[in-house]
């Protein structure tokens, strides 16, 4: 029995996997709103490299050498662990594995795309990147990536998370990022939101609008997105491609794969290489997207065209949405407080390839504490959603006696999210 499966540096995937040509039905194209030029504005805020990847129908896209060098520097490939302690705690015949994206220097999967986006922006002559962040994982990753690529970085951090997680601001600043709470006085849209509500908690949709507004108005400034779009999920497929090799080494075939979803990047990156096998009839695996009960995009949203941001600056995307003006409750899983979803993930849910479940905040912290006690690793509140669903599935196996193989995308650690755990332990959640 292998408790940890580690790959060599030379086993980092050489290419990213693009699921677009393998989707079960064509992906609906982005649209302009009536009278708008949102699509035409994209080359003003995104680098050529990521825009080409966004619409590409090539199945495999080579990872540039400079990006590969940084992947090695930050510790890829990441290990796959067997959760023996959790299995014993639950007394389940299921075998549980978790892919350790928390091994990254910034503590989550986000660097996989931050490095690539910063590389392509620098190649285009950008001097600065603007972005949004919820819990701070994405802002932290882009701050480091910009530092490594000799770029400036400005992060609009959702106000409720800015207040909940002060050390996230510190680490972003340590890497050279400028951090402002969103909504802010730095943009016209932010000022409008604050005028309506001076205590506005913010949302990812608002922060995206602010970051895009700044990028549109200034020269040599690009916008960088942490989730949702195809190029982001494409970069994250290094997770799933590595996991595939590691499960083969362990002699395992996954029966259930689980990840948390906000915009869908860690989940999509983890499962897309396996989704292709399922669509090709080579794999019988259930894919479960775990989302917050307070922001139930997949389980309660509508499948329709909507903006990716609150101000309506992005093109209209066909996805599950709660409405671009939806402001989620101020939960601790700030990285999942998003109204929309990756169009690819949304289409696969619509087609019945992916299932979705919504989990309440109290339950996710209960699951996180169990995992920490069993495995010694403190999961991020976002990651706890996936762990909670995995625990439910492992308990079902205990009842049925089935020896299923369950794989969790462990998207990040929670060492900078301890206020949420503290509130849970003190009975405030």
From Swiss-Prot:
The modification N6-(pyridoxal phosphate)lysine is found at residue 110. Keywords: Amino-acid biosynthesis, Aromatic amino acid biosynthesis, Lyase, Pyridoxal phosphate, Tryptophan biosynthesis. It catalyses: (1S,2R)-1-C-(indol-3-yl)glycerol 3-phosphate + L-serine = D-glyceraldehyde 3-phosphate + L-tryptophan + H2O. Residues 18-40 are annotated as: Disordered. Pathway: Amino-acid biosynthesis; L-tryptophan biosynthesis; L-tryptophan from chorismate: step 5/5. Its cofactor is pyridoxal 5'-phosphate. Transmembrane segments: none annotated. Belongs to the TrpB family. NCBIfam families: PRK12391.1, trpB_rel. The beta subunit is responsible for the synthesis of L-tryptophan from indole and L-serine. PANTHER family: TRYPTOPHAN SYNTHASE, TRYPTOPHAN SYNTHASE-RELATED. This is Tryptophan synthase beta chain 2.
């Amino acid at each position: 029995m292998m408790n940890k499966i580690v790959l060599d540096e030379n086993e980092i995937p050489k290419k990213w996997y693009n699921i677009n040509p393998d989707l079960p039905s064509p992906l609906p194209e982005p649209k302009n709103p009536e009278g708008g030029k949102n699509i035409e504005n994209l080359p003003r805020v995104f680098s050529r490299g990521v825009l080409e990847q966004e619409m590409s129908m090539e199945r495999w896209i080579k990872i540039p050498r400079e990006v590969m060098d940084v992947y090695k520097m930050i510790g890829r490939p990441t290990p796959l662990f067997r959760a023996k302690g959790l299995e014993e705690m639950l007394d389940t015949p299921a075998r549980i594995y978790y892919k350790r994206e928390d091994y990254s220097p910034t503590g989550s999967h986000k660097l996989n795309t931050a490095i690539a986006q910063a590389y392509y922006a620098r190649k285009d002559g950008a001097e600065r990147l603007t972005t949004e962040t919820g819990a701070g994982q994405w802002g932290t990753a882009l701050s480091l990536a910009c530092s490594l690529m000799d770029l400036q970085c400005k992060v609009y951090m959702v106000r409720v998370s800015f207040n909940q997680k002060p050390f996230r601001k510190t680490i972003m600043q340590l890497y050279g990022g400028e951090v402002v709470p969103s909504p802010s006085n730095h943009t016209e849209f932010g000022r409008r939101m604050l005028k309506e509500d001076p205590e506005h908690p913010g949302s990812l949709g608002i922060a995206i609008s602010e970051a895009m507004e700044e990028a549109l108005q200034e020269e040599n400034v690009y916008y960088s997105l942490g989730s949702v779009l195809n190029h982001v999920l494409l970069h994250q497929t290094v997770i799933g491609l590595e996991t595939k090799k590691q499960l083969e080494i362990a002699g395992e075939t996954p029966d259930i794969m689980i990840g948390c979803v906000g915009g869908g990047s860690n989940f999509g990156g983890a499962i897309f290489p396996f989704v292709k096998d399922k669509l090709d009839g080579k794999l019988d695996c259930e894919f479960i997207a775990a989302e917050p009960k307070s922001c139930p995009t997949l389980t309660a949203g509508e499948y329709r065209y909507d903006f990716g941001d609150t101000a309506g600056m992005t093109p209209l995307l066909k996805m599950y949405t709660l409405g671009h003006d939806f402001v989620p409750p101020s939960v601790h899983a700030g990285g999942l407080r998003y109204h929309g979803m990756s169009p690819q993930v949304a289409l696969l849910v619509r087609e019945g390839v992916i299932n979705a479940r919504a989990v309440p905040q109290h339950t996710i912290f209960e699951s996180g504490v169990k995992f920490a006690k069993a495995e010694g690793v403190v999961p991020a509140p976002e990651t706890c959603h996936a762990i909670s669903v995995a625990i439910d599935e492992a308990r079902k196996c205990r009842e049925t006696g089935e020896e299923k193989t369950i794989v969790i995308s462990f998207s990040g650690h929670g060492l900078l999210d301890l206020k949420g755990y503290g509130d849970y332990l003190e009975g405030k959640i």
